[in-house]
């Protein structure tokens, strides 16, 4: 991104730090330098690193193993894992909603009522 004067997109600014840590993700985004297979493996971005002449054979072996597994089980596992990603998106939306609500007239009235030990009156807050 940085090499094109762009900012991260597609939630990568949230997902990459969650996967590899904030400092490593910032370095990756800020410097815009490519990483090799060993680094990707060390950072947890890859499951394995193989020599270039073994890439196709390894991919074929993995595809054969996956094809032999129960398709509905694989499908449900993938769906559950995507739901975990949806949780991150939900947390982001919650944070935005919480932040905007903190300065709302309703919240101001609720805080004032709490400090004055009275029930809040929201009739003029909306």
Predicted regions mapped to residue ranges:
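Short aromatic/basic micro-patch
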Residues: 19, 34, 49
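Structural motif
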Residues: 43-44, 117
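CoA-thioester-processing core
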Residues: 1-30, 43, 58-62
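Acidic, divalent-metal-coordinating active-site segment for phosphoryl/phosphodiester hydrolysis
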Residues: 32-39
């Amino acid at each position: 991104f940085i090499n094109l004067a762009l900012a991260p997109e597609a939630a990568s600014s949230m997902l990459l730090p969650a996967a590899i840590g904030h400092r490593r993700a910032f370095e990756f985004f800020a410097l815009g330098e490519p990483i090799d297979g060993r680094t990707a493996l060390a950072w947890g971005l890859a499951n394995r690193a193989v020599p270039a002449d073994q890439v196709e054979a390894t991919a074929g072996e993995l595809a054969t193993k996956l094809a032999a597994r129960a398709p509905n089980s694989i499908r449900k596992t993938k769906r559950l894992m995507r739901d975990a990603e949806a949780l991150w998106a939900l947390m982001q939306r919650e944070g935005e909603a919480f932040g905007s609500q903190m300065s709302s007239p309703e919240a101001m009235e609720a805080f004032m009522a709490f400090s004055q030990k009275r029930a809040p009156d929201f009739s003029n807050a909306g």
